[in-house]
Amino acid sequence: MSTIKSGDIDKGSFLLFKGMPHIVLEREFSKMGRGGSIVRLKLKNLKNKSVIKETLKGSDTVEEIEVLEVNSQYLYKDNESLIFMDLETYDQFSVNLRDVVNLEDKVLFLQEAEVYSLIKWGNEVIDLKLPPKVAFEVVDAEIAVKGDTVTNAMKNVTLHTDLVVKAPLFINIGDKILVNSETKEYAERVKV
């Protein structure tokens, strides 16, 4: 593990803070009078999922966690676990939904046979990176009523992973759409 000055911490950094692994959710740098500076951090504990806010001096140091990014193929969901395959060794392994921060929110974006980046600390999976936009097929869509032409009229559509998002009225069953994985909002229709 290496130490890093608080002024060099970025959003998404992995830190060992008070003996526990954390991910930086937000970072705000403020320059004070007479050359001093402070860094305000919003940290999420990767073990118990608690969120804390910390204020550090610009000269303070914290331990940065050495993490490994591993590409793995998602195979299927089994009760409370997700089954992946390591693309180098072809070994299958499971990741418990409760062991990874925000994994329950990301499950609806996972598609079988797709490759995802898993963040490992030692032998433990601590995070899953999704692509910024994910393509889905629409399996159910509300019927658009004639006259619903107010600007930005939206309707609920259900995607093949059971994720429900708001989409424009012209989206129909069978269409493929891109969804922003961070905001869970419709991004665009996939052109065929």
Curated annotation (Swiss-Prot):
Keywords: Cytoplasm, Elongation factor, Protein biosynthesis. The keyword Cytoplasm applies. One of its GO terms (cellular component) is cytoplasm. GO terms for biological process: peptide biosynthetic process. CDD domains: S1_EF-P_repeat_1 (cd04470), S1_EF-P_repeat_2 (cd05794). It is found in: Cytoplasm. Pathway: Protein biosynthesis; polypeptide chain elongation. It comes from the Bacteria. InterPro entries: Elong-fact-P_C, NA-bd_OB-fold, Rib_uL2_dom2, Transl_elong_fac_P/YeiP, Transl_elong_KOW-like, Transl_elong_P/YeiP_cen, Transl_elongation_fac_P, Translation_prot_SH3-like_sf. GO terms for molecular function: translation elongation factor activity. Gene3D superfamilies: 2.30.30.30, Nucleic acid-binding proteins. Its main location: cytoplasm. Pfam families: EFP, EFP_N, Elong-fact-P_C. Belongs to the elongation factor P family. Involved in peptide bond synthesis. Stimulates efficient translation and peptide-bond synthesis on native or reconstituted 70S ribosomes in vitro. Probably functions indirectly by altering the affinity of the ribosome for aminoacyl-tRNA, thus increasing their reactivity as acceptors for peptidyl transferase. This is Elongation factor P.
